[in-house]
Each structure stands twice: as structure tokens, then as C-alpha cells.
Amino acid sequence: MSRWLMQMLMLPLLLLPLGQAAPKDGVARLDPEAQQQLTTNPFQPGPEQLRRLRDYLKGLEKMEEDPEQMNREQVLLYLFALHDFDQNGQLDGLELLSMLTAALAPGAAHFPINPVILVVDMVLETQDLDGDGLMTPAELINFPGEAPKRAESLPPALQEPQPAGSQPLLANSPLQSETQQSLGTKEEITSQVEAKRALEPEQEAGHHIETKVDALSPEGEARGQAESEGDAPGPREDAERQVESKDNEGEAKDLPAETLETQNTPNVVEAHSIQLENDEI
């Protein structure tokens, strides 16, 4: 009897530690939906992943645009800018952990060990292509196996930081390919102009040779004679020129007489004035 009583008294003492160690609802236990979300990459293209991220943005009070009207790239870029606390254009592990915890499992922040760390490791292993432990906007948007997005779709503030003298990571963007094509077209036009200039002296020399050959040929001689005959004055033109020359000679003969009369006029006037003075005296 006493032995059975002792066992009954010891039983609560044994169950007390187990009750304290059991997880409590809402504090140390995730709901099944959150546990399922932690098993997949939230940045993987798909309607379900996009719905989760949009739901998170809907809960933010400072959203100016309706998340339902935003596509996948816009949602990811907004999340990137929202959690890039040091504004260096890259997300480190802590910033990525803060983003995924707030978007996928807000209650996991109170866990002694955040289970979202496994998702961060999954994202870095899948999308951190250069292995530097940092996520850039291009790495966040361009999921492996998908077609790369256009580089100009990224806002200037989210462009990847590049060290001095290095090539941009998005060097194969359509914008740069168009620039290279325009440069190639310009080089082709320049080469064509230079080739044309190089051929101009040869064309001029060929033109002079053709002119000389044409002049030496019988047809060229006949053409030259016809042109010289066309330049020579005809009989009618000779007669007109002779008449004009005679008229000019007549005018030239009349001019000296008129000139003499003009020169003698002052002498006559002077003699007449002297005669008047003598009469008065």
C-alpha cells in the first residue's frame, strides 16, 4: 500500500519536466502551412510563391501600389529595396533572413533557432551563382533554368555595384548587344567611305585615260573639228562686225572736230570781251 502511494506521489514530479518541454501553440510550433512554405524556395517562379509574397506586401501599410497589379519582377525588386538596410545593392545573409522570416513565417522569429535559416541556405545554394554569400537583384530575379531578364528593367538604385575597371555582370543584356550592333554598323560605314576615297584617284586616272583615247580616236577628231567649226564665226557674222567697225571709225572722226570747237570757244568769248572794253574807253 505504501509502495503504491509513493508511486502516485512521484508521478507528477516525473511529468512536470515533460510538460514544460512540450511546445506551446503559437510560440514554438509552426502551423502546417508555414512548415510547408519552409520546404520550397519562395523565389522560384510560380503562382503559389508569388501569392505568398504578394500577401506579405498587402500587410504593409506603406504600400502605394496594389501588389495584385505587380508582376514577379516588381514584387522581388520591392522586397529587395525594402530589406537592403545598408543600401549597397546586395543582400547579405541577415538581410535575406529578415526578408524571408517576415514574408514566410513571422512567428519563427521567436524560435531559439530560426527554421527559416534552412530556407536562406537553400536560396544561397541555388541562386548565389558567384558564391560570395550575397544576393544581387539579378541573382534574385533570374532563377536558374529560366530565361535571363532584361538589364534595363532594374532601377538605377538597384544596379549591381561594380568595382572600378571591371566589366558589368549583365554584359550580355539586349541593351549592350544593340550598342555593339550600332558600333559594328558605324565601323562598316567608315570602312566603306575609306574604300571609296581610295578608289577616287583610280577613277580620276581612268577618266583622263578615257578622255585621251577618245581624243585620239577618229570619232574624237571629228567631234573636235565640229566643235571648232561651231566656234568659228560665219559670213553673216563677219559682215555685221565690219559694219560695226566702220560706224565706230566714223564716230571717232567726228570726235576730234567737236573737241576742237569746244577748245576754241573760250578764245572767242575772251576776244569779244576785250572788244567791248575798248569800245567803252
Swiss-Prot record:
Domain EF-hand span(s) in chain numbering: 71-106, 115-150
Induction details: By p53.
Binding positions for Ca(2+) 2 per the UniProt entry: D128, D130, D132, E139
Cellular component annotations (GO), alphabetically ordered: extracellular region
Modification sites for Phosphoserine: S217, S228
Compositional bias (Polar residues): 169-184
Signal peptide: 1-21
Keyword set includes Phosphoprotein: yes
An MF annotation (GO) of this entry: calcium ion binding
Annotated compartments: Secreted
Post-translational modification remark: Probably digested extracellularly by an unknown serine protease generating extremely hydrophobic bioactive peptides.
Binding site for Ca(2+) 1: D84, D86, N88, Q90, E95
Region Disordered, residue ranges: 146-281
Chain segments annotated as transmembrane: none
Basic and acidic residues bias (residue ranges): 185-213, 234-256
Primary localization: secreted
Tissue: Expressed predominantly in whole brain and kidney, with limited expression in heart, lung, liver, and skeletal muscle and no expression in spleen and testis. Also expressed in pituitary gland, adrenal gland, digestive tract, and reproductive organs.
Transcription regulation keyword on record: no
UniProt comment concerning the protein's domains: Both EF-hands are required for function.
Function per UniProt: Mediates cell-cell adhesion in a calcium-dependent manner. Able to inhibit growth in several cell lines.
Protein name (database record): Cell growth regulator with EF hand domain protein 1
Protein source organism: Rattus norvegicus (Rat)
